[in-house]
């Protein structure tokens, strides 16, 4: 047994990074005097005891998942660089999830916005498919050894029951609710929705091969239990059934699941799982909907108190535990993989504020190390098969350096949090 007094951060020597994993969040309170700068008022030493002779087993590689609101950033200068760095963590084993993959537009990104113009209609109302921008995004992933975690959404303008207004102009100073525009509504024609998804999935199979695409994840929408979905729960389940049936029509061995709910989903999640396991499928008329994985989101809740940020790790772990317990309550899902499809210190990567000041420094990295070390323990205790925890952070192209967004890099400069994933790898 060894004992060491330390005030080191994750950016210190490699051994200290290991201490963060073993000791968790206790390093957050350490001072900064080792850097030659004064320790914060009220700082205190932290003693960490490590038994190097005892092995607790391997840490499951749940960290291999990342994502962002803005899919088009992946094909831009700094985005390509960062995708390459993610792929290098563990080639062919890292996955990327993005919102807005089916949104209508010219492909120019903005905060919390992206588009591919994959679906339009001609003057006769006939579908026109264009995979050019989508191919560019997925080609970038594959060239760097990253695979898609395909989020089927959002609604193309030509299919939305309420297409106007469509593209939002959200800024961090605006109300979050301003993002919910025409893309968030149900389709005016579920058959056309299904055919769009089928044609997209078939195109992916033809372009990348069935053996490759069956290793991807496919799920419908994002957080349909909050206003990201402007329809009813029943309409979402219908949307999901038609999408899953379409993917499986293109590739019967495709890995499909969901629903990537906000939080554990509570009763909304239970209703979804009941439908998938025992309900009548809206698309096929048969019993149930294929469910190869179950996904939900878990977020922390940082606050700004007395001049410093107080991280809310308990909120994230509590939400994860709630989600695990919901899945565990279904015996049929005992061995079904679970993915926390967004697993972060808080809920808005593009938002700014004093409570989010942790993002540029080592508090973000320490928090991530502590959280990802504990999630497998919770999953094991609750009796579920945790396969992944997805970090919803990427980069923001053409923004000021260290602008306060939740990201892994800023204009090509890696942030400390990226070193956590290098350590995990």
Language-model features: where?
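N-terminal secretory signal peptides that target proteins for export/translocation
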Residues: 1-8
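Non-catalytic accessory regions flanking glycosidase/transglycosidase catalytic cores in CAZymes
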Residues: 12, 24-217, 233-264, 285, ...
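Aromatic- and acid-rich polysaccharide-binding/catalytic face
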Residues: 150, 197, 214-222, 254, ...
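Alpha-helix capping and helix-loop boundary segments enriched in small/acidic/polar residues
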Residues: 188, 231-235, 307-314, 359-366, ...
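Extracytoplasmic, non-cytosolic globular domains
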Residues: 236-247, 316-328, 344-347, 356-380
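Extracellular glycoside hydrolase catalytic/binding regions
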Residues: 273-277, 352-373, 406-423
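Active-site clefts of carbohydrate-active enzymes
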Residues: 299-308, 327-365, 394-408
